[in-house]
Amino acid sequence: MWKIMRSWKCGGMRWAHRQRPSHELLSQLSFDQHYKIRSNIELLIQDYASKPIAPLNYEYFLQYRPPLTKKEEYMLTIKTINLLLSLTCKRLNAIQRLPYNAVINPHIERTNSLYLKSLQTLLSIAYPYELHNPPKIQAKFTELLDDHEDAIVVLAKGLQEIQSCYPKFQISQFLNFHLKERITMKLLVTHYLSLMAQNKGDTNKRMIGILHRDLPIAQLIKHVSDYVNDICFVKFNTQRTPVLIHPPSQDITFTCIPPILEYIMTEVFKNAFEAQIALGKEHMPIEINLLKPDDDELYLRIRDHGGGITPEVEALMFNYSYSTHTQQSADSESTDLPGEQINNVSGMGFGLPMCKTYLELFGGKIDVQSLLGWGTDVYIKLKGPSKTALLSKK
């Protein structure tokens, strides 16, 4: 089912990858030839965009485990490329269906061009020979990651600029799908690269791609709290905020994707620490309660004493179009908290909505309960793979 065209014929002229610069080739085309090429590209995008994609789950990440055979490497490569092609084309299709005044926005146009470049990178893979050349595939996937590093920031600026003429509900809906598929693409690529590295024996034996078999939760929480404390000290010149973990004597481990939990805890801590600092209560501990009722479920409660959240803010906290922060100046970027450039872009709050997207991707959830004048409790439910799936050998 996997098809990649190395070259194609149009109007008697044959085009091959890396033959000549594209601008030279395009300048020699007649209008009809140019139209046919554009039409073929549109048909390709529509074809891949129409392919159904099963939701990403832990079973996908557990399909292949190091050490991989040559056949497993080959099959993993094909599956990853197929999924990336479909996701890239779905994003291109979604952007092109935006209203005209949105598509011509320079930031949104730049995002569209970025996804076209990603499509070109994926289509440039020579079938079938480069599928058996992991270093080349890894180089192309690394290029994809690098290209999309600031993609959300760029897109958010564009959407912010068209807010006055495009309904906020539709912007939020567009971002929901975009972020979910963007996160899926990143997870697919990083999982592939991690598996290839582990296949050489280069990494932690407790890892299966990006999945950690037994992540020490208290250790990760301490790492994140130390980091956010350091940044708060630089930014606000305040004392360190203590973090208490209950139960203190039990080191709970859980199977999950560490960067996802790290991002979520960073965002929650950022809000909790800043709220307490604003009230002069940085000396009061942030309380963390852990509960693991089953092998594939973990619950966390993060309690702060930052005075709570007003009902007006609480009703909007999961909206992309809402942020409690004003736009920051460029000279403050060196003291931004982790991910803050994404979490607050041109007045658009991305932190909690992205946490929600990450959690719901794998069957988890996040709830916030606030008592105005006192503090806020954040409840996080994490879902992991079942013990049967984790122990099964495929």
From Swiss-Prot:
Residues 126-386 form the Histidine kinase domain. Interacts with PKP2. Its EC number is 2.7.11.2. InterPro entries: AK/P_DHK_N_sf (IPR036784), BCDHK/PDK_N (IPR018955), BCKD/PDK (IPR039028), HATPase_C_sf (IPR036890), His_kinase_dom (IPR005467), Sig_transdc_His_kin-like_C (IPR004358). This is [Pyruvate dehydrogenase (acetyl-transferring)] kinase 1, mitochondrial. Residues 1-20 form a transit peptide. It holds the Pfam family BCDHK_Adom3. GO terms for biological process: protein-containing complex assembly; regulation of acetyl-CoA biosynthetic process from pyruvate; regulation of glucose metabolic process; regulation of mitophagy. GO terms for molecular function: ATP binding; protein kinase activity; pyruvate dehydrogenase (acetyl-transferring) kinase activity. It is found in: Mitochondrion matrix. It catalyses: L-seryl-[pyruvate dehydrogenase E1 alpha subunit] + ATP = O-phospho-L-seryl-[pyruvate dehydrogenase E1 alpha subunit] + ADP + H(+). It comes from Saccharomyces cerevisiae (strain ATCC 204508 / S288c) (Baker's yeast). PANTHER family: [3-METHYL-2-OXOBUTANOATE DEHYDROGENASE [LIPOAMIDE]] KINASE, MITOCHONDRIAL (PTHR11947:SF20), PYRUVATE DEHYDROGENASE KINASE (PTHR11947). It comes from the Eukaryota. The gene is PKP1.
